[in-house]
Design a protein with these regions (language model features):
Chain B
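Iron-sulfur-associated redox domains of electron-transfer enzymes in respiratory
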Residues: 1-234
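Ferredoxin-type iron-sulfur electron-transfer modules in oxidoreductases and energy-metabolism complexes
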Residues: 227-249, 267-358
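Short, well-structured alpha-helical interface segments that form or flank functional binding sites
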Residues: 106, 242, 246-252, 256-259
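Oxyanion-binding "anion nests"
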Residues: 229-234, 254-262
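Histidine- and/or cysteine-centered catalytic micro-motif in compact active-site loops
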Residues: 187, 256, 262-269, 292
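General structural feature for long, well-ordered alpha-helical segments within catalytic domains
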Residues: 21-25, 257, 283, 345
C-alpha cells in the first residue's frame, strides 16, 4: 500500500527571487530518485504539498509545465512557519514533494478552443504552467487563440518577468501585462487593475474558455466583466485556495460544501461553484 | 443457515455461553489477543486494555468516549526524521513502525461499529488509502454487544442502524440474563469464538428471547427522527436558512461534540522537534475551532461562529448525504446530546433541516 | 424557582418592548433532564422561552466579549464578577449592559446526580427548595439538593451579584463557614514528587478538546497561546508534558481573573477538576494582594496593575 502521506525527497537546485519585496521565490526541485519523477506525472493546474521536515507542509501550485522535464518549479510566498523555513533554505538542501494532487485545468475540453487567461499577483503560478504547456511545439496547434491578461501591484511584483517579456514578443500568444500603478517611466505596458484591463481589451468569448486565478478581490471584480463579455459560467474556470493539510481529501478541513478543494478541486467552473455555498 | 436480505451474508447458527462464564471467556481471549472492553472509571465507562477479565463492565449503555481511537488514535506519529543538516538522512521522512497485533474490542455497541463503516469511506478511497486506518481495521475484531435498553438520547434506528444491528461486527452478542447468545457474522468472529472456547449452540428458546429483546429495544426508541427529505433539499437553500442564527448562539465552539463523536474524523498534521529528532504527528482536530480554516494569508472563510456551527451540521446531515449516498454521518449514539455543555441537540437539527421549506 | 422565571421573563419583555436593549441573553429549557440551553432573544414575544432553574450553570458572560449591541444578560453572583473584570479589561462597556441579577443558591452537578443513580437513566427531574425529585423507568428518587451542588457552588462565598441593574429576588445569605482551599491545602502538604504524581493523574484523562478554555468567560484571546505557531509554545498532541503545560499556563493566565464559576469543570467531557489549579492561584492572590476577583468595578485585578510599593524588585 503506497503511503499517500509520504513525500518524494527532492533537492533544491536553484532559488530565484521573483519579486522586489523578496517575499516570492521560485524553487527548482530535482528528484533524488529518478523513479519518483516517473511517478510524479502531472497536468497543468495541479498542486503538490511541499514538505519541510520539522516545520510542516504547504500546498503550492505547480508552476512548471509537464513539458519541462527533469525538474519541478514552485513559486512560494513567504507567509508563515513553513514558507519562512523554505525561504531560508539553500540550493543543495533536501526537502519533500508530495503529489501531484488535485484536479487540473480541463485540457481535453480546451482542445480546439480559444483560451483566455486572467491572472493576478502570485496566483499566476499554475497559469505559467498552462501557458508553457500550450506554447510547447507539440501542443500549440491543439489550441486556438491564447490571450493572457496578467497584473501585479507594481512592475517589481510581477512573476516570471523575463518569460513574460519573451511571450510578449511572440505572435502566437497575445499578452496584456498590467500593473496597478507605477512611477517607472520605462514601463511600456498597461497600467490599471486586471478587471479594468480585461474589460478594455475585451477578449472574445466566442469558442473561448477563461482561466481565472488571483486574489479574491480580483476574482470578484473580474467575473462580472467576463460574464458581460459573454462567457457563460461553464466556460469560466478558476482555481481556488484553501487551508489544507493532508491534500488527499481525508483531514476534512478544505471543503466547500460537498467538495474537497484538495481532491475535487482546486479547479472548478463558475457553474460548479454556484451550486456550492459561497464559503471560500 | 439463512441469508439476511440486507447484507447477503449468510448468518451462521448462533452459539451461546453462560453469562457466569463471561470472565473466563475474556481471560481466554486475553491470552491470544490484545483485548479491550468497557471499564468503569469513577462516573464514566471507557474502553481500556484489560489486565484481567473481571475488569470489564458492560452495565453502561455506552462509553463516554467513542471507540474511534482504535482505528483513528487521537495522536499518531506518522513519520520520524532527524534535523541534523549534515546527516545523509537530512530532510528524509521514515514511516514509524506500528505494533499492531490482532486485537479484540469486546462489547462494542452496534452504533459504534456502524460508525467505522461510515468513516471507511473517508480513509479508504479508490484514489488514496490511509495505511494507518486500514491496518487497524484489518487487525481489529469487533465483538459487539446488543443494546437491550437503549437510552432516551439514542436514535440509532433513525439513521440506518439499530440496537441489534450487526453492521460491521464480527460477532453480535445478546445478553439474555443467564445466557449470552453469540451470533457469528464473519470468519474472524468464528475464529475468536473458537479461541474463547464458545462452542455451545443457542437453543430455539434463546433465539426467541433474543428476538423479543430486539423488538422491545427497537420499540423503546420511539418514533424516528425525520431524514427522508435531506437528500432532496437544495444545498444552498439549507445553507442560507434563517434558523442557523438561533442554533449557533449557545455554542461555545468547545469541540467536545467532535471529540466524542464516532463519525467525526478531521485531523491536523504537525511536525514536532526535540533536539535533533522530530516526528510528523497527526492529531484530532475539529471544525468547531476558529483556526481550522484559517489561511496563511489571514483570510478565514469560517471566521464567525455561525459559519462553524453550520458547517458541522451541514456536513453531517447534508454534504455527507449528497457526497456518498450512505445516509447521514451520524449513528445516533447520542454522545453529543449528553456531553454538549450548552445542550445543543442534534436531534433538533434533524427536524430543522429535514423539514425546512425554502 | 418559578418566581425567578417569571421575573426574568417580565424583565426581558419589558426591556425589549421599551427598546432599552437590543437583545436578551438567558436560558431556555434543555432537551434532556438537568440541562438548559443559553438563548438569545430579540423580540418581546420570545420572552416566554426564558426559564430559570438549578441547571443554569453556564456562565453567560462567556458570550459578551466584543459584542456591540445593548445587551440584557442574566447573571448569577459568579457571572456578575466575570462581567466586572470584562468591563475593566475593555471587552464590553458598562453602558451596553443591563444586568438582570440572580441571587443564586447553587447549581446542580448533573454528573454527580447521574453517578448517584448508578446507571439508571433519569427521564424527568423536578426540584423543590430542598430536594431534587428524579423519575425514570421504574424508579423515583428524592435527593437532597445541597449534597449535589457543583463543587464550586458548594464553597461559594459570593452568591449574590455584585453588579446589576435589577435583581429578580431578595439577596440570599452568603455562606461564611466554608474553607475554599481545603483541597488546595491538602496538595500543598504533599512532597514535590507526590504533587507531580498527583497532577499527572489529575490531568491524565485530558483529551485536549479545549472545552475548558472555550467555556471560560475570561479566555477571549483572539488567538490562544496553544494556537500560536510563530513561535509555537507547546505541542498539540496528547503528550503529557504538553497537556500539563496547557493547563498550568491557562491557570496562570487566569490568576486574579478567575471567579470559580465552575464552567471549566462542568464542561469537561472527562470530568477533570482543573479548578484546583485555579484555586491555588486564587489563594495566592488573596494572600499576597488581599484581592478577590471582580468584587468591585473600582478595583483592577492585581496582575494588570502596578503600584509603586509593589514588592518585586525588577519592577524598579
Amino acid at each position: 500500500m503506497q503511503n499517500p502521506y509520504l513525500p518524494y525527497p527532492v533537492r533544491i537546485d536553484t532559488i530565484t527571487v521573483e519579486t522586489e519585496d523578496r517575499n516570492l521565490k521560485t524553487f527548482k526541485f530535482v528528484f533524488l530518485n529518478p523513479e519518483d519523477e516517473k511517478r510524479f506525472t502531472y497536468k497543468a493546474g495541479q498542486f503538490a504539498e511541499l514538505s519541510v521536515t520539522g516545520k510542516g507542509e504547504i500546498p503550492i501550485g505547480i508552476a512548471s509545465s509537464p513539458t519541462e522535464k527533469g525538474y519541478l518549479l514552485f513559486t512560494v510566498n513567504k507567509v508563515g512557519v513553513v514558507t519562512t523555513a523554505l525561504h531560508q533554505m539553500s540550493p543543495g538542501d533536501i526537502m519533500g514533494v508530495r503529489g501531484p494532487l488535485g484536479n487540473w485545468y480541463p485540457w481535453e475540453i480546451l482542445e480546439g478552443r480559444n483560451v483566455v487567461i486572467v491572472g493576478g499577483g502570485f496566483a499566476f503560478t499554475t497559469l505559467r504552467s498552462s501557458i508553457v504547456y500550450m506554447l510547447h511545439p507539440d501542443n500549440r496547434k491543439r489550441f486556438g487563440d491564447i490571450t493572457v491578461i496578467y497584473g501585479a501591484r507594481t512592475p517589481g511584483m510581477l512573476l516570471y518577468k523575463e518569460e513574460l517579456m519573451a511571450w510578449e514578443r511572440r505572435d502566437d500568444i497575445k499578452m496584456h501585462i498590467t500593473v496597478d500603478a507605477t512611477k517607472d517611466p520605462s514601463w511600456k505596458y498597461h497600467v490599471g487593475f486586471v478587471p479594468t484591463v480585461t474589460k478594455d481589451t475585451a477578449p472574445s468569448s466566442e469558442n473561448a474558455y477563461a482561466l481565472v486565478c488571483g486574489p479574491p478581490i480580483m476574482i470578484k471584480f473580474t467575473l462580472p466583466v467576463l460574464t458581460g463579455l459573454g462567457f457563460p459560467p461553464e466556460r469560466i474556470i478558476t482555481s481556488l485556495e484553501m487551508r489544507m493539510k493532508c491534500g488527499i481529501g481525508m483531514c476534512g478541513r478544505c471543503n466547500i460544501g460537498t467538495e474537497y478543494v484538495c481532491k475535487d478541486g482546486p479547479v472548478f467552473t463558475l457553474a460548479q461553484l454556484s451550486q456550492l455555498p459561497a464559503e471560500y | 443457515m439463512y441469508v439476511n436480505p440486507a447484507d447477503g451474508i449468510p448468518r451462521m447458527a448462533k452459539r451461546a455461553f453462560k453469562k457466569a462464564a463471561l470472565i473466563d471467556v475474556l481471560n481466554r481471549l486475553k491470552e491470544r489477543y490484545r483485548l479491550y472492553a468497557p471499564v468503569r472509571q469513577n462516573d464514566m465507562t471507557n474502553y481500556q486494555e484489560l489486565a484481567s477479565g473481571d475488569q470489564a463492565d458492560f452495565s453502561a449503555s455506552n462509553t463516554r468516549l467513542s471507540p474511534k481511537s482504535f482505528m483513528h488514535p487521537q495522536s499518531l506519529c506518522m513519520f520520524a526524521f532527524g534535523t541534523d543538516k549534515g546527516s545523509d538522512q537530512a530532510g528524509i521522512l521514515r514511516e514509524v513502525e506500528k505494533d499492531l497485533p490482532r486485537s479484540v474490542v469486546f462489547g462494542i455497541r452496534p452504533c459504534d461499529s456502524k460508525a467505522f463503516q461510515l468513516v471507511d469511506v473517508n480513509f479508504n478511497t479508490p484514489e488514496y488509502q490511509d495505511p494507518w486506518w486500514i491496518r487497524r481495521r484489518q487487525s481489529t475484531t469487533l465483538v459487539g454487544m446488543a443494546c437491550n435498553s437503549p437510552c432516551s438520547t439514542c436514535f440509532c434506528t433513525s439513521v440506518g442502524s439499530g440496537p441489534f444491528s450487526p453492521d460491521g461486527l464480527d460477532v453480535l452478542l445478546t445478553d439474555l440474563g443467564d445466557d449470552v447468545v453469540a451470533e457469528v457474522m464473519t470468519a474472524w468472529g468464528s475464529e475468536v469464538l473458537d479461541h474463547a472456547d464458545i462452542r455451545g449452540r443457542a437453543t430455539d428458546a434463546m433465539t426467541e428471547k433474543a428476538t423479543a429483546l430486539q423488538q422491545e429495544a427497537e420499540r423503546s426508541l420511539g418514533s424516528l427522527l425525520p431524514t427522508e427529505s435531506l437528500r432532496e433539499k437544495n444545498l444552498n437553500a439549507l445553507f442560507n436558512a434563517p434558523f442557523w442564527d438561533d442554533v449557533q448562539f449557545a455554542c461555545i465552539n468547545c469541540g467536545v461534540c467532535t471529540f466524542v463523536c464516532p463519525t467525526c474524523w478531521c485531523f491536523d498534521v504537525q511536525d514536532e522537534v526535540r533536539n535533533q529528532q522530530g516526528v510528523r504527528v497527526r492529531n484530532w482536530d475539529a471544525c468547531m475551532y476558529p483556526l481550522f480554516t484559517h489561511h496563511g494569508s489571514g483570510h478565514n472563510p469560517r471566521h464567525q461562529k455561525l459559519q462553524r456551527v453550520r458547517q458541522r451540521f451541514m456536513h453531517k446531515l447534508k454534504y455527507f448525504v449528497d457526497k456518498y449516498d450512505r445516509g447521514v454521518a451520524c449513528v445516533g449514539c447520542g454522545r453529543c446530546v449528553q456531553q454538549c455543555p450548552v445542550n445543543i441537540d442534534i436531534r433538533q437539527l434533524f427536524r430543522l433541516m429535514n423539514d425546512f421549506k425554502g | 424557582m418559578e418566581a425567578y422565571t417569571e421575573k426574568i421573563r417580565e424583565a426581558a419583555q419589558r426591556l425589549l418592548k421599551e427598546n432599552k436593549v437590543d437583545l436578551v441573553m438567558g436560558f431556555q429549557r434543555g432537551t434532556i433532564p438537568m440541562m438548559s440551553q443559553p438563548v438569545l432573544i430579540r423580540k418581546a414575544n420570545e420572552g416566554e422561552r426564558l426559564h430559570w432553574d438549578s441547571h443554569c450553570g453556564s456562565n453567560l458572560a462567556n458570550y459578551l466579549p466584543k459584542r456591540k449591541e445593548r445587551i440584557a444578560v442574566v447573571a448569577k453572583g459568579c457571572d456578575s464578577r466575570n462581567i466586572v473584570v470584562q468591563i475593566l479589561e475593555n471587552q464590553i462597556r458598562r453602558e451596553q449592559l443591563y444586568i438582570i441579577g440572580v441571587p443564586c443558591l447553587g447549581m446542580i452537578d448533573r454528573r454527580q446526580v447521574l453517578g448517584a443513580l448508578q446507571g439508571r437513566e433519569p427521564l424527568s427531574v423536578s426540584e423543590t427548595n430542598a430536594h431534587l425529585v428524579i423519575q425514570g423507568k421504574g424508579f423515583e428518587e428524592k435527593l437532597e439538593r445541597s449534597l449535589f451542588l457543583q463543587d464550586n457552588c458548594a464553597i461559594c462565598i459570593h452568591r449574590n451579584p455584585v453588579l446589576f441593574d435589577e435583581l429578580v429576588a431578595e439577596p440570599v445569605p452568603e455562606q461564611t463557614e466554608v474553607d475554599r482551599y481545603e483541597d488546595v491545602k491538602g496538595i500543598e502538604k504533599m512532597t514535590a514528587d507526590e504533587r507531580w504524581q498527583y497532577f499527572r493523574e489529575l490531568l491524565g484523562p485530558c483529551i485536549r478538546c479545549y472545552a475548558c478554555r472555550n467555556a471560560c468567560p475570561m479566555c477571549y484571546c483572539p488567538t490562544c497561546f496553544v494556537d500560536e505557531s510563530t513561535p509555537q509554545w507547546l505541542g498539540k498532541s496528547i503528550d503529557p508534558t504538553d497537556t500539563t503545560t496547557f493547563h498550568f499556563l491557562r491557570a496562570y493566565h487566569l490568576a486574579g481573573r478567575c471567579t470559580d464559576c465552575g464552567n471549566c469543570q462542568r464542561v469537561c467531557p472527562v470530568g477533570i477538576n482543573m479548578r484546583q489549579l485555579n484555586k491555588k492561584l486564587e489563594k495566592e492572590i488573596k494572600e499576597r494582594y488581599g484581592y478577590e476577583t471582580g468584587r468591585s468595578i473600582e478595583q483592577r485585578p492585581p496582575l494588570d496593575t502596578y503600584r509603586p510599593d509593589d514588592a518585586q524588585q525588577f519592577f524598579k
